Amino acid sequence: MALPTARPLLGSCGTPALGSLLFLLFSLGWVQPSRTLAGETGQEAAPLDGVLANPPNISSLSPRQLLGFPCAEVSGLSTERVRELAVALAQKNVKLSTEQLRCLAHRLSEPPEDLDALPLDLLLFLNPDAFSGPQACTRFFSRITKANVDLLPRGAPERQRLLPAALACWGVRGSLLSEADVRALGGLACDLPGRFVAESAEVLLPRLVSCPGPLDQDQQEAARAALQGGGPPYGPPSTWSVSTMDALRGLLPVLGQPIIRSIPQGIVAAWRQRSSRDPSWRQPERTILRPRFRREVEKTACPSGKKAREIDESLIFYKKWELEACVDAALLATQMDRVNAIPFTYEQLDVLKHKLDELYPQGYPESVIQHLGYLFLKMSPEDIRKWNVTSLETLKALLEVNKGHEMSPQAPRRPLPQVATLIDRFVKGRGQLDKDTLDTLTAFYPGYLCSLSPEELSSVPPSSIWAVRPQDLDTCDPRQLDVLYPKARLAFQNMNGSEYFVKIQSFLGGAPTEDLKALSQQNVSMDLATFMKLRTDAVLPLTVAEVQKLLGPHVEGLKAEERHRPVRDWILRQRQDDLDTLGLGLQGGIPNGYLVLDLSMQEALSGTPCLLGPGPVLTVLALLLASTLA
């Protein structure tokens, strides 16, 4: 009774409060919009009382006018006018409700000659007996194949009479079908009884995969037996691959425990990981935990005999509300290690996560976390911040699950937010980064060290530095290298010469001036890429001779970098005479006869351009004219 009231209110200039109330009712699902009032095109129906009976040409009516015709008005039209209306509806692609289609079909007392001119879905409501003879029925069911059969429920009388008529028309005898027969049946193939599934599994199972509604009990048993038998097209479950599991998605609820146990567990795990990245499986995930769903589920009792005694393969046959009602959260928590071996759908995993969330509102214990497996992919950073993760084995297990999901698409060099949060919780729980932890983290995410703050890096022991590779430091900034360099220097202190330089080279972005001076005496031949990453304040005090010794044959590269820091700033602090000794044509040094007084080294690094470098300096003429006069 709510719909007749809702329609004029929504279509009129009602009060904002009333409109908001109706919008709320629609959004909560307590009031459903009538399909007789608006089609799938989103058009609003116009009042049509008497419109159909008066115009000389129904095709002149707009789609908006045609959309909302009442059945009572159609019943007063002649057969010819009804046919004219049906043709106009098809031409203007007007989407009709089931009742409107049934009403039109009832008024078409004689079978139409031009089926192509009628709305496709209207044919579902016509009596197939009216199209007798091979040519007539073939033409009729060829059109039915393209219609939306699921507009009719499986139990509807119109749908029940279509399948036997179609089988007779296509000359099907017995239960053996060809691939051409299945194609000819279209959506009606989803209604074929179990005996057809048993005898024609090779051609029928691939069609049943895409059937929108659940199979009936007879069909399920036949499909299960066919799959367990290992015949074509899928073969024995023990030989299934990830692509086989993909192809069987629509039939997963049909699989029994013997079938599931026969599938290689590595294949199940790989398929689960691959499917989690498929957007088509992610779309409905969050809908099942909306408040309205939760309220409805909580009020539903577990059906007799379905209370779960253990977490096993039988649960994949449970509907979402049955999982919520029949699986005890405490049982789930103690048997989490079994979940990954069972091919739950991602909607079912949502229900399991919801149950754990209710059992542990303050965060999961580590005994549960370490067995989350693929359920970890459903966790948000907010969920993970409640955890206390201290076991390296737990961290390894969850990082293994995330292989293939490690990097964020928005920032490819950064891990996904939930992974970054997990690592953060682990590091805080452990208190320091030992070698085993660092090995694990850098193997998973090479840039991990550079994602830590200087304060967090201070917990890295020098002994762990041996596990750091050059690429692990690519994105570190000077503040981070300032912390890591002293640790690296301590770790490699017993090495000499070129071996020491090879190990320390990646950390030199944090080296002070005195260490660079020491390296210049060892003929290390530092490359320009490393030199350009040195701290500017550490490079500025170096003399031309020290830089020449530090770079060795690579000193010629200074010319190409003379406009970039730190080379630019270093040039501005050198005497031009000294720069000229390099023979590189470097310009911008201090002219002869000038004395430079640097008032503030800190200000000199502030970036303000001046004669002798970035920062305020006082330049005075060394041989002042006054002294000459004197």
From Swiss-Prot:
UniProt keyword terms in alphabetical order: Cell adhesion, Cell membrane, Cleavage on pair of basic residues, Disulfide bond, Glycoprotein, Golgi apparatus, GPI-anchor, Lipoprotein, Membrane, Phosphoprotein, Secreted, Signal
Post-translational modification: Both MPF and the cleaved form of mesothelin are N-glycosylated. Proteolytically cleaved by a furin-like convertase to generate megakaryocyte-potentiating factor (MPF), and the cleaved form of mesothelin.
Mode of membrane association: Lipid-anchor; GPI-anchor
UniProt keyword Metal-binding, yes or no: no
Disulfide bond entries: C302-C326
Glycosylation sites: N57, N388, N496, N523
Main subcellular location: membrane
Record has Membrane as a keyword: yes
Short name of any one Pfam family annotated for the protein: Mesothelin
GO biological process, one term: cell-matrix adhesion
Start and end residues of each stretch annotated as Required for megakaryocyte-potentiating factor activity: 262-286
Lipid-binding residues (covalent, GPI-anchor amidated serine): S606
Gene3D superfamilies, sorted: 1.20.970.40
Subunit structure as annotated in this protein's UniProt entry: Interacts with MUC16.
Family: Belongs to the mesothelin family.
Annotated disease: Antibodies against MSLN are detected in patients with mesothelioma and ovarian cancer.
Annotated function: Membrane-anchored forms may play a role in cellular adhesion.
Protein's UniProt name: Mesothelin
Organism: Homo sapiens (Human)
